[in-house]
Structures are given as structure tokens and as C-alpha cells.
């Protein structure tokens, strides 16, 4: 498509701002930023890879904000980070070798999966926290990273559920670890799609900056907003989006 207009860039920036805030509070922000790129006319694969690149600064900011909770977790970050990098590379390679028609066919299902993860994450975390066998952790993180490298929406939710299932740890420390692993997945995916994918760089730059601002604002207000209501609002929006995408 042609270069986006100033109004379209403003729209994408606003969507990324909101997505950054939603990610900081409840997760699932890509369910806002990805369809915004579709709405201004980008094909699904181009929209997805652009969204992957735009997410990187937000993940970096979130990881920096959790640096205190990451203290003492260097070994976990290195070991699981390596697993995440391999999974992200595999998922991104799969994405770059998927035709637009095939990707269009699976996107509605991926959006519904992200919605389901967002809906059940609190219940899942409480029900299985620390109960999964430790040996499954790397396998589950790998699968989560493959998903994140391929699509991205719901990555943080999936990783947090996986970590909570395998590690009996304080939720804030798990959230910090989740953020670090998400950053690894985002960086690996962004480098790969930046080199080989149809990234729309101008929108990606605008959205990246806006997502950082949204993430900071969301983090500052997270304790005062009804996260549950926001979570269900995003889920409802995502279900409608999946239906619209399926009927396109």
C-alpha cells in the first residue's frame, strides 16, 4: 500500500498508546494494535510483522521497570531466554514462510486463542501454580515462544501461565521473568522480520514510541483501574474481531 497519511499515523499511534497501557494492566494489547494496522489497509502478514517490531520498546520498558524483581533470577533468565530465542526463531521462520492466504485463514483462531488465554489467565494461575513438573518448563516456554514469534498477541499471558504452572514463586517475580522472556522473543522476532519481512517502518516507529508512553501510563495507573473489567472488555472486543476477520 502507499505510505500512510498523517491521520492514519495518528490513528495507529493512538492504538499503540492504548495497546501499551492495556499490556501494562491486563495484557492483550496486540488485539488493539494489530487490527489497527489491518484497518488502515496493511495485509495481514505485513500488519503482523510491523506489530512485532513495534512491541519491542514496550517490552524493554516493562523489563526495566521490573529490574528489582529480576534480582536473583539471572540463571533463569539466561536458561529460559535461550529456550525462548530458539522458539521465537522457529515461530518467525514459520511466519515468513506462510502465505498471506494461509495466515488469513489462521488469524481468527489465533485471536480467539489469545482471548481465551486472557480470559482464563487468573483462574489458570491460581489453579496450577507450581504444580506442573519442573522438566516441562523449557518445553512449555519453547512452545509459547514459537507462538509469540509467529503471531505475538497473548504471548505474555501464555508465558505467565506457563511460568506459574511450573514455578512456585511470587507473582511479581514471575511477571518480571515473563517480561524478560517476552523481550527476548520480541527482539529475535523483530530482527528476523526486519531483515526478511515486509515491515512498514514508518508506522512501526510511530507505534513503538506511542507504546512506550502507553506502557508507562498504564503501569502508573494499574493499581487504580479495574483490571478485571478491562480484561473482559478486551476479550469481548477480541471475539468480535475474530468473527469480523473470519467473515472478511
Label each residue range with its predicted role.
Residues 1-43, 128-182, 205:
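Selected transmembrane alpha-helices and immediately adjacent juxtamembrane segments
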Residues 6, 10, 49, 102-112, ...:
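Alpha-helical transmembrane segments of integral membrane proteins
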Amino acid at each position: 500500500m502507499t505510505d500512510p497519511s498523517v491521520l492514519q499515523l495518528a490513528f495507529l499511534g493512538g492504538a499503540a498508546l492504548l495497546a501499551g497501557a492495556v499490556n501494562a494492566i491486563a495484557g492483550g494489547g496486540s488485539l488493539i494494535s494489530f487490527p489497527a494496522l489491518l484497518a488502515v489497509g496493511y495485509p495481514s502478514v505485513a500488519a503482523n510483522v510491523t506489530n512485532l517490531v513495534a512491541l519491542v520498546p514496550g517490552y524493554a520498558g516493562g523489563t526495566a521497570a521490573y529490574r528489582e524483581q529480576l534480582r536473583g533470577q539471572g540463571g533463569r533468565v539466561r536458561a529460559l531466554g535461550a529456550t525462548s530465542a530458539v522458539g521465537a526463531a522457529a515461530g518467525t521462520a514459520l511466519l515468513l514462510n506462510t502465505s498471506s492466504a494461509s495466515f488469513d485463514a489462521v488469524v481468527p483462531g489465533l485471536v480467539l486463542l489469545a482471548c481465551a488465554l486472557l480470559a482464563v489467565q487468573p483462574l489458570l494461575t491460581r489453579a496450577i501454580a507450581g504444580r506442573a513438573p519442573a522438566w516441562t518448563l523449557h518445553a512449555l516456554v519453547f512452545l509459547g515462544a514459537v507462538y509469540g514469534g509467529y503471531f505475538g498477541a497473548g504471548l505474555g499471558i501464555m508465558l505467565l501461565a506457563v511460568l506459574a504452572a511450573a514455578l512456585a514463586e511470587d507473582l511479581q517475580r514471575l511477571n518480571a521473568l515473563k517480561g524478560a522472556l517476552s523481550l527476548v522473543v520480541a527482539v529475535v522476532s523483530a530482527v528476523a522480520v526486519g531483515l526478511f519481512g515486509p515491515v512498514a517502518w514508518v508506522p512501526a516507529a510511530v507505534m513503538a514510541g506511542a507504546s512506550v508512553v502507553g506502557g508507562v501510563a498504564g503501569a502508573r495507573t494499574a493499581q487504580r483501574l479495574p483490571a478485571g473489567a478491562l480484561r473482559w472488555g478486551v476479550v469481548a472486543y477480541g471475539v468480535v474481531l475474530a468473527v469480523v476477520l473470519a467473515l472478511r
